[in-house]
């Protein structure tokens, strides 16, 4: 919404207050999702129907850099029929080959493989124009951004706050952690001092009350009553002072989850062995000659270019593992709708028995993930992608699987949630196979990485990521 507002779009469903001053003549924009009107355009019309300002030398150079066949520019293929990665590539080529003063990007790394993410990072670093982008990818943020605009909901997601810091992402993240620790310590100190003061006050008050009840002398009684009035006045001053004490900070987006009571399979137990396997969709061969052995406590990461068949490989592993009695399999798809029942509420989706105790436990878990009570009982389709992702994580934790298959597990989570996601899966006692282009996730969670190519799986050194 902020991005579209800065671009000058009128948003009928939102109230925009304030003033935007700009003298920009040209801008470039790549949205998170392919617009409906663009889906119906052919590649030819997209590139050449209105090409007065198109720089053809840049156009063909970018096609080569992004490994996109430039002969397809004149194709009648509709953009909506391209893969997510290809659709993003042609938008990057189109927007970068036209002149612009400012570039707006919405989650640009979502549909790019690691090689293409590196390409985009390098181009942003070299750009002289202003770039404003939304991203959840910490590695991408840390290597491109020099100013952070942090939009967040505080006070149990009831109040909006905007922070602007002219810092790179890692410095901003370190500053947030330091501020959080400092405020937590100050809040604890204030609370201890307040408790000590109130304990002393309660003793004085109790002594005066005891003396009042025991006295039979009217003069002494009047003096004690006056003293009690002063004590009560002091009590009100303490209560008022308590309102200005440093409050314990809440990490609004923190994910407080961990796997417990997991019975992992033996580390040496072979679950799947692929030998000279072929991956295909219909008649189209994606990759062949695959060799892979998966054991009970392996943590395997799969990387590779878009369209090579990473999700297809994960689906094959899902098929092979699902039929094994000793395996309790957890699955987190890239498209949450494959698992979530969108017409149910989060509580209904997570509940297996409907018993009161189970419902209370589920609501407690959801509350720890910053779900409001209404969100717990609204239909899942009304939740944001991040909230739906949290729901899937909680479902995994509650089902107690001993092996996991994860397809881009960090895709919809905010940067402030990412460290907790990595910690959750790094500490998972069972095994997992994950498809990801998130370098930090791969390095902190996985013990082995494979790159999927058309010729099979190749071992990748973690240090080379």
At which residue positions do the language-model features occur?
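ABC ATPase nucleotide-binding domain signature region
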Residues: 3-56, 147, 152-157, 296-361, ...
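ABC-family P-loop ATPase nucleotide-binding domains
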Residues: 25-87, 98, 334-395, 399-401
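Coupling and communication elements adjacent to P-loop NTPase active sites across diverse families
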Residues: 54-77, 175-283
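Hydrophobic anchor residue at the start of the ABC signature
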Residues: 92, 393, 421
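Walker B catalytic motif
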Residues: 107-108, 113, 405-409, 413-417, ...
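Conserved H-loop
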Residues: 137-143, 338, 438-444
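Conserved beta-strand-loop-alpha-helix hinge in the C-terminal portion
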Residues: 153-185, 452-465
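Flexible loop/N-cap segments at domain edges
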Residues: 248-334
């Amino acid at each position: 919404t902020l991005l579209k507002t800065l671009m000058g779009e009128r948003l009928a469903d939102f109230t925009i207050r304030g003033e935007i001053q700009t003298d920009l003549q040209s801008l470039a924009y790549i949205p998170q999702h392919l617009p409906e009107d663009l889906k119906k355009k052919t590649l030819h019309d997209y590139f050449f129907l209105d090409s007065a300002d198109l720089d053809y030398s840049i156009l063909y150079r970018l096609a080569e850099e992004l490994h996109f066949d430039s002969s397809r520019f004149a194709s009648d293929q509709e953009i909506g029929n391209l893969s997510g990665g290809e659709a993003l590539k042609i938008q990057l080529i189109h927007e970068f080959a036209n002149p612009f003063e400012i570039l707006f990007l919405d989650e640009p790394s979502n549909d790019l493989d690691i090689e293409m993410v590196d390409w985009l990072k390098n181009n942003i670093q070299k750009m002289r124009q202003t770039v404003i982008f939304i991203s959840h990818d910490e590695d991408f943020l840390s290597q491109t951004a020099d100013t952070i605009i942090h939009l967040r909901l505080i006070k149990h997601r009831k109040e909006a706050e905007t922070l602007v810091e002219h810092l790179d992402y890692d410095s901003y993240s370190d500053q947030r952690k330091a501020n959080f620790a400092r405020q937590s310590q100050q809040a604890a100190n204030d609370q201890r001092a307040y408790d000590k003061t109130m304990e002393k006050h309660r003793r004085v008050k109790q002594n005066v009350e005891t003396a009042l009840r025991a006295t039979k002398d009217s003069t002494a009684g009047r003096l004690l009553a006056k003293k009690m009035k002063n004590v009560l006045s002091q009590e009100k001053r303490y209560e008022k002072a308590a309102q200005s004490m440093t409050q314990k900070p809440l990490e609004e987006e923190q994910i407080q989850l961990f796997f417990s009571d997991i019975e992992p399979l033996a580390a040496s137990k072979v679950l799947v062995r692929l030998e000279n396997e072929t991956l295909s969709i219909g008649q189209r061969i994606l990759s062949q000659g695959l060799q892979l052995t998966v054991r009970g406590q392996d943590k395997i990461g799969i990387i590779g270019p878009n369209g090579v068949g990473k999700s297809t490989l994960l689906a094959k592993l899902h098929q092979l593992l699902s039929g094994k009695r000793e395996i309790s399999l957890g699955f987190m798809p890239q498209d949450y709708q494959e698992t979530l029942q969108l017409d149910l509420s989060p509580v209904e989706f997570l509940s297996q028995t409907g018993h009161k105790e189970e419902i209370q436990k589920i609501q407690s878990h959801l509350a720890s993930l910053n779900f409001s009570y209404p969100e717990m009982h609204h239909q899942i389709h009304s939740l944001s992608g991040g909230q739906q992702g949290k729901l899937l994580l909680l479902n995994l934790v509650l089902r107690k699987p001993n092996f996991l298959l994860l397809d881009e597990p960090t895709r919809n989570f905010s940067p402030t949630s990412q460290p907790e996601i990595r910690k959750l899966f790094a500490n998972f006692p069972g095994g997992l196979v994950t498809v990801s282009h998130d370098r930090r996730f791969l390095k902190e969670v996985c013990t082995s990485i494979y790159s999927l190519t058309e010729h099979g799986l190749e071992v990748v050194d973690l240090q080379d990521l």
